[in-house]
Amino acid sequence: MAKQDDASIQSPDIGEPPAAAREVFGDRLRLACDYAEFLATAGIERGLLGPREVPRIWERHILNSAVLGEVIDEGCRVVDIGSGAGLPGIPLAIARPDLKVQLLEPLLRRYNFLAEVNSQLNLGCEVVRGRAEDPAVVEALGGADVATSRAVAPLGKLTRWSLPLVKVGGAMKALKGGSVAEELERDAKEIAKAGGGDGTIELVGESKVAEPTHVITIPRIR
C-alpha cells in the first residue's frame, strides 16, 4: 500500500476515514486505512465481502469490530473464531496492539487473505487454519483469555465452539444483532451445558458509530 499523510488518506470508493477512526486507531490509522483498501479490493475480488459493502466498510465493518476493544482487558490473548475477512480480529489488533490476536479460519482462500494482510501490514497476529471444534485446534489455541466472533453461528453453537478455547475465568465475546437477548434466553441450557455462566449484553461504540455494537459476553465457569 502506498504511504501518504493521514490528512490525505482516501479512496474513491471508501472515502475519508471518519473522525471516529482517528480516535479509535490513533497513530495506527494508516494501518486501518491500508486494511480498508484490502477489504475494498482483494476482499471483494475473493468474495469475502459483497461490492455493496464498500461504502460501508468503515462504519459497518472496521469500526464496528474495533470498538470491541472497549470490553477487553489489557494484554489479553484473543482467539478470533471464523475470522473470515479478519472481522473483528484485524481491526481489534490494529486498535489494540497490546493484545495477542490469533485469527482462526477453516477455509483456505480466507486463510490466505488473512495471512497476506497480516504479513503486508506487519500486524504480528498468528493466523491459524482450522475449525474451533477440532481437538487439535483446542489443544493448540486453548487457554485464551477471550474468544471473539462476528456473525458466525447461533449463540448456543457458538458457545460450544468458543468456550473450550478459553481458560476457566476467561470469556467469549461475540458481536451480535439486536435479537441477542432472545438468543440468550433460547440457548440458556446449551450455554450452561458448555460450561458457560450468566451472559451479559453490552453496547459498545456508542460515541463512535451510528449503530452501536451489541456484545454478548459469556464467561467460562468450568
UniProtKB/Swiss-Prot annotation:
<feature type="binding site">
    <location>
        <position position="87"/>
    </location>
    <ligand>
        <name>S-adenosyl-L-methionine</name>
    </ligand>
</feature>
<comment type="function">
    <text>Specifically methylates the N7 position of guanine in position 518 of 16S rRNA.</text>
</comment>
<feature type="binding site">
    <location>
        <begin position="132"/>
        <end position="133"/>
    </location>
    <ligand>
        <name>S-adenosyl-L-methionine</name>
    </ligand>
</feature>
<keyword id="KW-0963">Cytoplasm</keyword>
<dbReference type="Pfam" id="PF02527">
    <property type="entry name" value="GidB"/>
</dbReference>
<protein>
    <recommendedName>
        <fullName>Ribosomal RNA small subunit methyltransferase G</fullName>
        <ecNumber>2.1.1.-</ecNumber>
    </recommendedName>
</protein>
<keyword id="KW-0489">Methyltransferase</keyword>
<keyword id="KW-0698">rRNA processing</keyword>
<dbReference type="GO" id="GO:0070043">
    <property type="term" value="F:rRNA (guanine-N7-)-methyltransferase activity"/>
</dbReference>
<keyword id="KW-0808">Transferase</keyword>
<comment type="similarity">
    <text>Belongs to the methyltransferase superfamily. RNA methyltransferase RsmG family.</text>
</comment>
<dbReference type="InterPro" id="IPR003682">
    <property type="entry name" value="rRNA_ssu_MeTfrase_G"/>
</dbReference>
<keyword id="KW-0949">S-adenosyl-L-methionine</keyword>
<feature type="binding site">
    <location>
        <position position="82"/>
    </location>
    <ligand>
        <name>S-adenosyl-L-methionine</name>
    </ligand>
</feature>
<feature type="binding site">
    <location>
        <position position="150"/>
    </location>
    <ligand>
        <name>S-adenosyl-L-methionine</name>
    </ligand>
</feature>
<dbReference type="GO" id="GO:0005829">
    <property type="term" value="C:cytosol"/>
</dbReference>
<dbReference type="InterPro" id="IPR029063">
    <property type="entry name" value="SAM-dependent_MTases_sf"/>
</dbReference>
